[in-house]
Amino acid sequence: MKTTAFLLTMLVPAVVSAQQKPTTGYAPVNGLKMYYEVHGSGEPVVLLHGAFMTITNNWTGWIGELSKTRKVIAVELQGHGRTADIDRDISSANLADDVAALLDHLKVPRADVIGYSMGGGVAMQCAIRHPDKVRKVVVISSMLRRDGSVKEALDALQHLTAETFKGSPLETEYKKLSPTPNEFPNFVKHLLAAAAKPDDLGADKLKATKAPMFFIHGDADGVRLDHIAEMFRLKGGEIFGDMRPRSESRLAILPQTTHVTLMQRMNVIVPMVNDFLDAKPQKQ
């Protein structure tokens, strides 16, 4: 089954690089015991994984590179990895509030945020709901609302069930890390129910955000090209930059790249991300 094959590829790790042992802990936020890791030192950047993912299978390799010059705060969101699920909607708004509370717990007043897939939606929500806590945002293969996906991806989502994941690497990873290893079927049902809801972040709200955003996509990542353009346009894109100052936000579309293989293009993406995060505001 093609859908199952796709899901199995989600755990293909990125390039591994040597990393020093991080500081780890559990933060009491909004009824959760949220697991987090802190790597390196410097300006803080928060990493937000995709649905069904963990720190390890989403960010291996990335953390080693980013933590060379930054304080990397990697988290596991509600129900994922070492963070147990609770009786609460898994919505981008709730997850963004959890991230903001974690920053308070760590006494980090402001940070950059990088999110992949589901984590990209959470990253945008952080900028919408907690603007004072977010400096810049990197959104990797994510959407402003559900209908930003191509029809093929939306159709595939409707056919997923807990049974689809039985015996998969996703289930193995869950049982290895979760404090409730026998709850995987219920977690899958909870997350799929959340994914079926029209979680629209709001075009006007995104446009009103002050944090510059870098939208990174593959040309075959399942997000409609017109939706990608819409998000970039809302953040000041689509101008003639030789005639007036460019937007502080950016857009990159990588050729021959899918939703999954984007995370394997670390050697291309990380330098662009570092350049974006390090960039000074343009002179007007």
Q: What are the roles of these predicted feature ranges?
A:
Residues G121-R129, R135-T172:
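Flexible "cap/lid" loop of the alpha/beta hydrolase fold
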Residues D242, S247-Q284:
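Catalytic active-site module of serine/aspartate enzymes centered on a nucleophile-bearing elbow/loop
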Residues G222-E230, L262:
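Conserved alpha/beta-hydrolase "acid-adjacent" motif
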Residues S67, A74-I114, L254:
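Active-site loop/oxyanion-hole signature of alpha/beta-hydrolase fold enzymes
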Residues K189-K205:
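Active-site nucleophile elbow and catalytic-triad environment of alpha/beta-hydrolase enzymes
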Residues T209, F215-H217:
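Short beta-strand/loop motif that positions the catalytic acidic residue
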Residues L32-A84:
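Conserved HGGG/HGGXW glycine-rich cap/lid loop of the alpha/beta-hydrolase fold
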Residues K2-V46, T69-R70, D278-Q284:
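Alpha/beta-hydrolase fold catalytic core
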